[in-house]
Amino acid sequence: MAGPGYEKSVMVALLPTTRDWTHLALPHLTLVYVGEIDAVRPTLYNELAKDAMTAADSFGNLDIPVVGVDEFGGGDQPTVDALRLVPTTQLLALRRIFDRYNGSQWAEFDPHVTVGPVGSATVVPDTILFDRISVCWGKEMVSYLFRQPDR
């Protein structure tokens, strides 16, 4: 993942199919922040990857409605524009799979994707389509495509 601090972080994220609405090199929806690499046991990577693979086989693409633009951050974090997303039934079910890994200081799941610095949200799509789930372990990332419909 791009951004300061991510090189030491462990998370599970959803990756979108388009990037025209963001200024980030690798836009994502953080499904669960697990913690810092040094604070989690190394074997957790295998557990996260297994759960992500199972989730990818169980879920199809997620087309999630955008509610609007909001500002996130502050304190020791830069303030950014983010697209707030509807917590759909499918998204919440996917999040529940990974709840036990939550190492975030925020207990509530607040689905959003970062656009860039404040004032940079010039394109606001109606929905964002996510077709992959990724396990991010610092600079390492493994991604799985969601189940695709038979053609």
What are these model-derived regions, one by one?
Residues 1-151:
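Histidine-dependent nucleotide/RNA phosphoesterase domain, centered on the 2H-phosphoesterase fold
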